[in-house]
Amino acid sequence: MQTTCEICEVPAHGIHFGAITCRGCAAFFRRAVNTKTNRKSCKYSSNCTNFTGKFPQCKSCRMRKCIKMGMMPEKVKVMQPISQSLEIFVSRPNLILFTNNYDKTRNYIDVSNLITRGLEILKQGFPTPLGIGKTNLERMASGVEFSTAESKIVDVVTGKSVSMVWEFDFISTAKWLTRLQDFCTLPMRIQMQLLQTIWHVWSRMYKVVKSSELRKKHADSSNLFQVLDQFHVNLGTTKLDVSWLTTYSYEEIKYFLYGIDDDIYLQSAITAASKLELTDVELTYMAAQTCFQYAQNRFAGTEIAEVCAKFQEILANDLHTYYTKDHKRTSNYAGKLSQMLKCVQEIQKSIRTTRERTTIARTFDIYITDFSNPEMFIDSGC
């Protein structure tokens, strides 16, 4: 196979729009086809031959050579107007800011406003009245709504859409944690560190549960996935704009986002959750177990690990109390708990495989995002 670009003769990347070209010429051809402005004619009798970028190139001659070498305009997908994006559905100020670095090769994402909002929630502490006579687990369950009523489908997911999901997940996790009374007695430094550690783990469990409920309500729904309260996507048809994350196309980086089998472990967790008829208390226990076990492993041997082990013990005792309060719940206690823990294990596998793919993407600069608080996005997939 030819190893040089047929247009500018630099090392080729592959076949683009019908010719063997480099990335630069492929991008030029795509822009040229999609542009609405008239192209200026050549000033040098249409005899330009050097398109390596060492001096201003003649776009007219470059386009003419692209056509001559076999590049076909009909193979370029015309940009469609963005419709039904998440920001159309949701109207609220952004707590996450996307900006370009000085060299314009990387995107800087400032989440400091979101951190400040989370800190405000933590400082407010647990809501009052907290629920007299209720266990920690029951109080945490009352703070999360897993209903998928009136869920709408989103056709396009953009960077702004992703930031809205992050905001919802981070703030929801902060409110959820404040319903655990022992959490509110921790030093604020540890509270914030735990929040920044587990918010994306809580997010995975939330989306698994919401997606399982959503799929029960729709026929032929194996591709439906809940991303935000009352909004979902179709993994087969919803468009994903990843320009905020990478310079590559979605098709080129899909593996790093979902793996070979569209995150088979997360899909397995959704399937497992769909087979269970879980109450809000049971769902909350499953979420708490996933979050605190993850944090315990991540901070093994530290004070945070000890705190997370204590929380798991408290909530396990609360779950036992919940089952023994009503003899009807104890009929398949062990079997149900086993299925719940299986779901937890699938999510943990999803986190581990995501970590491996993200490490590769970061190592080879496939992802071009830099965060103001990078510790918050460890194992988040970005």
From Swiss-Prot:
GO CC annotation terms, alphabetical: nucleus
Domain of life: Eukaryota
Keyword Metal-binding among record annotations: yes
NR C4-type ZnF: 5-25, 42-61
Record-linked SUPFAM superfamilies: Glucocorticoid receptor-like (DNA-binding domain), Nuclear receptor ligand-binding domain
Residue ranges occupied by any NR LBD domain in the UniProt entry: 110-380
Keyword annotations of the record: DNA-binding, Metal-binding, Nucleus, Receptor, Transcription, Transcription regulation, Zinc, Zinc-finger
Keyword Zinc-finger (UniProt): yes
Subcellular localization(s) per the UniProt record: Nucleus
DNA-binding residues: 2-78
Role according to the record: Orphan nuclear receptor.
Family: Belongs to the nuclear hormone receptor family.
Record's protein name: Nuclear hormone receptor family member nhr-106
Species of provenance: Caenorhabditis elegans
